C-alpha cells in the first residue's frame, strides 16, 4: 500500500498520509512521494488541495526509527531533501491548500499543517511541537510560521515546553481556522474544500501570493503590489464572469481561468 494516497475528484486534489500503523510518520519514501503528489496538484485540473491523514493521526512527523538507522538518511538530508521541499511546494502552489487535521499533528507533521492556507481540525485532534523533548529545534518552517500565527511569547512556550495543544485551544489561539465536532468533521471539511474548488482559482492564488509576501513588505510597498496584482486579477475570465453574474443576478460559474 502506498504511504501517500492521491486522487483528483471534483477539482480537488486529495492527498492522504497513509501509514496509519506508524501514526503517518514520515520516512524518506513517504516524503518524496508527498513531493510528487504536490507537484501533480499543479495541474489545472486541481483547483484546491486537501491534505489529511488515514487512521487516528494526521502525522506524527519524522519516523524516528529511520533517524536511528545508521544506514538511513542524515539530518541534513531529512530536512533539505525531504521536509523543506514539502513546505516550500505547499507555499508555492498557486491554489488554496486545506489541511484537515483528523488526529494528532506532531513535530514536522504539525508544521506541514500550519504551512497550509486553511487549517481545520476535528475536536479530538491536537498539535504538539515535540522537538524539544528529544533535543531538536522545530523545523519544517515552524519557527517562521508559528510566531506569526500566535505571537512570540506563546510560540516560544509551546516550542520550548513541548506542550500539547488541543484543537479547541488551537482555534482560540488563531493557530487554526476552525474546529468541528468529530462526527461532522469530514463533512464540514469537504464543504470548505468544495467551496474553494468552485471559486476563482487565480484570484485565490493572487491573494495567497500577497499574503505570503506581506510578511516582509512595508505598507506602502504592499499597496503598490496590490495595485499590480489587482490589474492582473481584473484580466481573468473568472473576474468577468463574477461581474456579469452579479449584474445578471445569477450564480457565477467560475472555471479557474
What is the meaning of each model-derived region?
Residues 30-34, 79-82, 112, 185, ...:
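Hydrophobic alpha-helical membrane-association signature
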Residues 158-160, 210-214, 229-234:
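Helix-loop "lid/cap" segments that line or gate small-molecule binding pockets
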Amino acid at each position: 500500500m502506498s504511504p501517500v494516497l492521491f486522487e483528483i475528484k471534483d477539482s480537488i486534489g486529495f492527498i492522504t498520509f497513509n501509514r496509519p500503523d506508524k501514526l503517518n510518520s514520515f520516512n524518506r519514501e513517504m516524503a518524496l512521494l508527498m513531493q510528487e503528489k504536490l507537484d501533480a496538484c499543479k495541474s489545472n485540473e486541481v483547483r484546491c488541495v486537501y491534505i489529511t491523514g488515514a487512521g487516528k493521526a494526521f502525522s506524527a512527523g519524522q519516523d524516528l526509527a529511520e533517524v536511528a538507522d545508521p544506514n538511513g538518511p542524515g539530518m541534513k538530508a531529512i530536512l533539505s531533501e525531504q521536509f523543506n521541499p514539502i513546505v516550500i511546494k505547499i507555499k508555492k502552489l498557486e491554489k488554496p491548500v486545506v489541511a484537515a487535521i483528523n488526529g494528532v499533528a506532531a513535530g514536522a507533521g504539525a508544521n506541514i499543517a500550519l504551512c497550509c492556507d486553511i487549517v481545520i481540525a476535528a475536536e479530538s485532534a491536537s498539535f504538539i511541537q515535540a522537538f524539544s523533548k528529544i533535543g531538536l529545534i522545530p523545523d519544517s518552517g515552524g519557527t517562521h510560521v508559528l510566531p506569526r500565527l500566535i505571537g512570540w511569547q506563546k510560540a516560544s512556550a509551546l516550542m520550548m515546553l513541548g506542550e500539547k495543544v488541543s484543537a479547541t485551544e488551537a482555534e482560540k489561539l488563531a493557530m487554526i481556522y476552525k474546529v468541528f465536532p468529530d462526527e461532522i468533521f469530514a463533512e464540514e471539511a469537504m464543504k470548505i474544500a468544495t467551496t474553494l474548488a468552485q471559486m476563482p482559482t487565480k484570484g485565490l492564488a493572487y491573494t495567497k501570493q500577497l499574503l505570503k509576501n506581506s510578511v516582509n513588505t512595508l505598507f506602502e510597498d504592499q499597496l503598490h503590489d496590490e495595485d499590480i496584482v489587482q490589474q492582473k486579477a481584473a484580466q481573468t475570465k473568472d473576474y468577468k464572469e463574477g461581474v456579469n453574474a452579479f449584474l445578471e443576478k445569477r450564480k457565477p460559474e467560475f472555471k479557474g481561468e
